[in-house]
Amino acid sequence: MAAKIKKGDLVQVITGAKAERGGDRGKQGKVLRVFTDTNRVLVEGINRVTKHTRVGQSQRGTKTGGIEVVEAPIHISNVALVDPSTKKPTRVGFRLDTVEKNGVKKTVRIRVSKSSGKDI
């Protein structure tokens, strides 16, 4: 099955606590990575967690470790793709289209916004 959300897409968090209560619901961000085996996506600026790493030394002799804030993956069902034309979250459908390349006809799936009906 073709992926409904891909790397580089703009998505919006649709579940969880509201932003005014410290959550991420309603926030938008760009997809940095898609984990297909666990059905999770890494979204820029969303689901930020504090990670404590042990202090050590790198090969150059500099100190490593400390407290850093990184993004954690979020389940793909908790985000919705943002329609580029309306800037609102939408469901994604597919449309089959035949493309002729070098004399060979090939059927490709094109992602379509369910709300506006336009190609994504």
From Swiss-Prot:
Query: What is the organism field in this record?
Result: Pseudarthrobacter chlorophenolicus (strain ATCC 700700 / DSM 12829 / CIP 107037 / JCM 12360 / KCTC 9906 / NCIMB 13794 / A6) (Arthrobacter chlorophenolicus)
**Transmembrane feature ranges:** none
Complex and partners: Part of the 50S ribosomal subunit.
Give the protein's function.
One of two assembly initiator proteins, it binds directly to the 5'-end of the 23S rRNA, where it nucleates assembly of the 50S subunit.
Q: Does Lipoprotein appear among the keywords?
A: no
**InterPro entries assigned:** Rib_uL2_dom2, Ribosomal_uL24, Ribosomal_uL24_KOW, Translation_prot_SH3-like_sf
Cited NCBIfam families: rplX_bact
State the GO CC annotations.
Answer: ribonucleoprotein complex; ribosome
Please name one Pfam family that this protein belongs to. ribosomal_L24
Under Gene Ontology molecular function, one entry of this record is:
structural constituent of ribosome
Q: Which UniProt keywords apply?
A: Ribonucleoprotein, Ribosomal protein, RNA-binding, rRNA-binding
Family (UniProt) = Belongs to the universal ribosomal protein uL24 family.
Please identify the protein, giving its name as recorded: Large ribosomal subunit protein uL24
Could you tell me the Gene Ontology terms of the biological process aspect for this record?
translation
Species classification: Bacteria, Bacillati, Actinomycetota, Actinomycetes, Micrococcales
Lineage, top-rank taxon, reads Bacteria
